[in-house]
Amino acid sequence: MSGLSPEQRRKSIGEIMFYMRNYSVPSLIMIFFAFAFIGWVWEVCLHLVMDGEFVNRGVLAGPWLPIYGCGALLALTLLKTLREKPWLEFLASIFMSGIVEYGTSLYLEWTHDGQRWWDYTGYFLNINGRICAEGLLVFGLGCMGIVYFIGPVLDSIFRRVKLKILTPICVVLIVLFSVDMIHSHDYPNTGKGITDYAVTGEEAPGGISQGMP
């Protein structure tokens, strides 16, 4: 922004941070993969710090946790009407995150012979070990950061990329992700630090990092 007047600089920042924007399909696709990757990095780092070892978190083989990407897209699109009311946005984000996480837990158990990739048993206000108050609070706060800051910034960045460049990137990512989904349906990612959580009243290893697939 060098060379811009203070007024032009404020206007440019305002455009970047405008959270009532409409997101294009290519931007939404890129945002999905961005947050799927960020979620994977988040959980890997938590496990690395708390347990001292690298673990490829999640059901899939690749460096992405799609539930984070889905949560980001739902927050940016379904909750737009609440954008001017942050407290309602926050509460709705918590409710939405609970539905997504609980539903994902049921789906994974149903499609993988009862196998669980996380268990919140023993956490405060947990429901069947699938969701808990602590996790939902974290995800609700995360959604607020996404809709009011990170999402608009990422969208502003992606809008600067020409469609003839952005479109092939989206296609390649979708193809790789689809292949991973198909492969992981029959050969899911399991093992130490992934599915070896506590199933009684004890906390899962890695704490809240066990909360997302």
Question: Each PLM stretch: what is its role?
Answer:
Residues 1-213:
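Aromatic-rich, lipid-facing transmembrane alpha helices and their immediate juxtamembrane interface loops
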